[in-house]
Amino acid sequence: MAIFARRIGLNQHSAYGSRQRVIVMKNFGKKALIKQQSPKRVAWTGALAASLIMLPTMFGGNPVLAQKAERESLSYGELIQKVNQEQVKRVELDETEQIAKVYLKGQKPDAPPIQVRLLEQNNELINRLKEKNVDFGEISSANSRAAVGLLINLMWILPLVALMLLFLRRSTNASSQAMNFGKSRARFQMEAKTGVKFDDVAGIEEAKEELQEVVTFLKQPERFTAVGARIPKGVLLVGPPGTGKTLLAKAIAGEAAVPFFSISGSEFVEMFVGVGASRVRDLFKKAKDNAPCLIFIDEIDAVGRQRGTGIGGGNDEREQTLNQLLTEMDGFEGNTGIIIIAATNRPDVLDSALLRPGRFDRQVIVDAPDLKGRLEILQVHSRNKKVDPSVSLEAIARRTPGFTGADLANLLNEAAILTARRRKEAITILEIDDAVDRVVAGMEGTPLVDSKSKRLIAYHEVGHGLVGTLLKDHDPVQKVTLIPRGQAQGLTWFTPNEEQGLISRSQLKARITSTLAGRAAEEIVFGKPEVTTGAGDDLQKVTSMARQMVTKFGMSELGPLSLENQSGEVFLGRDWMNKSDYSEEIAAKIDSQVREIINTCYQTSKELLQTNRVVMERLVDLLTEQETIEGDLFRKIVSESQNPVVDEQLSMVNSQ
């Protein structure tokens, strides 16, 4: 599998507001606010009333508590005397009530016992009872039994009260949530403390300068109003994922020192009709109350897509939300003092009314960083990491074209994890190399065992690297490896020496030729019947490149023509499928030109490999033994094997 460069694709909180209803009454010419009684207070009042109603029933139904007969009593000292005089027949001790029931000798059988109030310590009484052989024992009082009965009754009542409170609370929460659906879920910070400053943002200097000016607008508006300048109402950050759009918004919030609202585009629309528009109104109402302020809407394409028919009829609620957003941003009333910052990676799907000046006055492109930007980003993210002095950040920046800021941060983090796993004290170039491979191609797999399959893969990968090295218009080879990563059994890496914004026809043909060289090497060594499915991904890539050369870039015998329209988004009311603005005859010619380009490049790769069969075998033996050949060593071996005949052939191929 040949890897040329990173491909970058464009992909595409919440606090409930609370409302307290009030009743306004006129009192001596002044307005007095009377809070409506809360449902929770009503619930507790009802529970208390129910308990008070039940208590008389519980206590009234207990005859022991309702009736208390007056009984004869003795003092504690008198009881001791009667025990000494052997006048006591039996004593019942009630430790709970701290009383003793005394039965005297000669007392009538139906006479009630005499009650005596006990002390906390009754050891003397018990010793005297034992000495005089008086019968005594412990009993439980009627009051203790009544307490047990009360607890049993409460065991039935408390669950009922708790259940009633639960139902009341749920009904209260349901009504409260229903009233709060229309409230904005934007997170509000009076002075946002994000921990991010403009010094923490690197690699996107142009975008940073634009947004620093917005902060200056907020802090020193007189500098601009003095010359008649108007504060921009909106700034749209556009760029692929991972380039730092949200990081820039955090930096603005940390630098501006003004109230800051942040919300995601998906937090506007809910399941209920009208909620989205209501939340937009509530958001801008709060913003006007705190002006001057900033509003950050992340992923605005979730609510700002183009209005149109699309497929189905379920997009009307989103359109209402967008219409309300357009009105609030630049409608009849205006929103002086509010600056809106939005971020998206799908600017092509946004409604044109949203993008016009007066709503989003500026569109700031936040693209993947160049070499200088990548170096600055690596310097920022390496501040808190232990990096070996031998590691060159500039070399890392050169070998990572197409990497975004998020990719570079992840790269250094993976290198730090590998360093800790290997129990090293600092990150070395070995961990950096492994981290790059892991980020681009995936996890490292189990090494291949020595077999025919391993040697076949070695021929395939050496074919890519050898042809790419022989063609002068091709990017230099960086590494050829047999270590499996992700879905690939082997990998060949090519890294450009410089940033390439434009690609020539000869460069495209060189890439097609080297990509086909893997299949060509298999056919030369093992024969056409033994070619494998390993070149399937390579064939898809070269077919796509060749077709684009013919239909999009005008690099074929058909002339400088663009023959295919871009596919539209069906859910935006655009084309259902690609439109072909040419006849069947032209379509046949397109197919013929695509086949001609691919076949020509395939024959070129076969000729180069056959001419350099000796060096190919040498490289395959070395790769099978070491499993990885670095780019410098690979190019050195190829240059040592060059001869005048090969050089003459290469000059002819490169001139085609």
Curated annotation (Swiss-Prot):
**Molecular function terms in GO for this entry?**
ATP binding; ATP hydrolysis activity; ATP-dependent peptidase activity; metalloendopeptidase activity; zinc ion binding
**Which key words tag this protein in UniProt?**
ATP-binding, Hydrolase, Membrane, Metal-binding, Metalloprotease, Nucleotide-binding, Protease, Thylakoid, Transmembrane, Transmembrane helix, Zinc
Q: Where are the transmembrane segments?
A: 46-66, 148-168
Residues annotated as binding Zn(2+) are H460, H464, D538
CDD domains for the chain: RecA-like_FtsH
Stated EC number for the protein is: 3.4.24.-
Q: Does the keyword Aminoacyl-tRNA synthetase apply?
A: no
Q: Does the keyword NADP apply?
A: no
Cofactor annotation remark: Binds 1 zinc ion per subunit.
A Pfam short name: AAA
Q: Where does ATP bind?
A: G239, P240, P241, G242, T243, G244, K245, T246
User: Which segments does the topology annotation call Cytoplasmic?
Assistant: 1-45, 169-656
Question: Which sequence ranges are listed under topological domain Lumenal?
Answer: 67-147
Any one GO cellular component localisation term in the record = plasma membrane-derived thylakoid membrane
The cellular location(s) given in this protein's UniProt record come to:
Cellular thylakoid membrane
Q: Required cofactors, per record? A: Zn(2+)
State the annotated membrane topology for this chain.
Multi-pass membrane protein
Q: Catalytic center at which residues?
A: E461
What processes in GO biological process is this protein linked to?
protein catabolic process; proteolysis
- Database matches in HAMAP family: FtsH (MF_01458)
Instruction: Summarize the protein's role.
Output: Acts as a processive, ATP-dependent zinc metallopeptidase for both cytoplasmic and membrane proteins. Plays a role in the quality control of integral membrane proteins.
Similarity comment: family membership: In the central section; belongs to the AAA ATPase family.
Question: Can you state the subunit structure given in the record?
Answer: Homohexamer.
Alphabetical list of NCBIfam families matching this protein: FtsH_fam
Name this polypeptide is given: ATP-dependent zinc metalloprotease FtsH
Q: Which organism is it from?
A: Nostoc sp. (strain PCC 7120 / SAG 25.82 / UTEX 2576)
Q: What is the lineage of its organism?
A: Bacteria, Bacillati, Cyanobacteriota, Cyanophyceae, Nostocales
